[in-house]
Amino acid sequence: MAATGEALTPQGYIQHHLTNLSVGEGFWTWHIDSLFFSVGLGVLFLWIFRSVGKKATSGVPGKLQCFVEMIVEFVNNSVKESFHGRNALIAPLALTIFVWVFMMNFMDMIPVDWLPHAASLMGIPYLKAVPTTDVNITFSLAIGVFLLIIFYSIKVKGVSGFVKELTLQPFNHKAMIPVNLLLETVTLIAKPISLALRLFGNLYAGELIFILIALMYGTNLLLSTLGVTLQLGWLIFHILVITLQAFIFMMLTIVYLSMAHEDH
């Protein structure tokens, strides 16, 4: 049952699958597996879309080109409906976020023992293949969005406009500046935190459920049969979850950046 080929207790099995391959200690710990899969999937996304773009023709498109065009059109329409400013970066950014996050989420569809077992054959003791079950990855994505929010808020409104937004809303009175600053700062900081924790929480919970279902295998015939049924049912439902979470992350990014472009 263990990915390393050793007999593990149920608690040890769960802990093994939730442990990252890491180097360093404390704050300076690097999760090598999360970095490898997130960067690798990002490169794969760029390669696929670049290849399709170079081979695109005005004639009858192939299946892959149709699929890519459908995604691009869907994201482009989402941006048109939700983003009210003018910025040529937003649509490519939204496309990158949606596809990249979906691809990282989709790694959760691979049976939980396959990749860790393959890694153990190469002498790698731990392997987490779903980058979005690592809070460091989700916070990295969210912080990137947060920095863009700050950048465009200052670029569009100016430093003085940005400061006024933090100090004179929602109560437009000088006496309320401390209260406004506190409320607006909390609201601003809550954006990346909610983005990161929502994605992490949903994918971590989904991964944990797959692991718990996998524990049923090898116990007895009844539980093994039940495990197969549960695995299939959760797999079908989880496809909706991973797609929805990628969509939500993309849409909130678009909305937050649209708010940053509003010049009052």
From Swiss-Prot:
Any single GO CC term annotated in Swiss-Prot or TrEMBL for this entry: plasma membrane
Gene giving rise to this polypeptide: atpB
Membrane topology note: Multi-pass membrane protein
Transmembrane segments: 29-49, 90-110, 134-154, 177-197, 208-228, 235-255
UniProt cross-references to InterPro entries, sorted A to Z: ATP_syn_F0_a_bact/chloroplast, ATP_synth_F0_asu, ATP_synth_F0_asu_AS, F0_ATP_A_sf
Annotated source species: Shewanella baltica (strain OS155 / ATCC BAA-1091)
PROSITE patterns per record: ATPASE_A (PS00449)
Task performed by this protein: Key component of the proton channel; it plays a direct role in the translocation of protons across the membrane.
GO molecular function term, any single one: proton-transporting ATP synthase activity, rotational mechanism
Pfam families: ATP-synt_A
Keyword Cell inner membrane annotated: yes
Protein name listed in UniProt: ATP synthase subunit a
Quaternary structure note: F-type ATPases have 2 components, CF(1) - the catalytic core - and CF(0) - the membrane proton channel. CF(1) has five subunits: alpha(3), beta(3), gamma(1), delta(1), epsilon(1). CF(0) has three main subunits: a(1), b(2) and c(9-12). The alpha and beta chains form an alternating ring which encloses part of the gamma chain. CF(1) is attached to CF(0) by a central stalk formed by the gamma and epsilon chains, while a peripheral stalk is formed by the delta and b chains.
Stored CDD domains: ATP-synt_Fo_a_6
Compartments where located: Cell inner membrane
Keyword vocabulary terms for this entry: ATP synthesis, Cell inner membrane, Cell membrane, CF(0), Hydrogen ion transport, Ion transport, Membrane, Transmembrane, Transmembrane helix, Transport
GO-annotated biological processes: proton motive force-driven plasma membrane ATP synthesis
Domain of life where this protein originates: Bacteria
Stated family: Belongs to the ATPase A chain family.
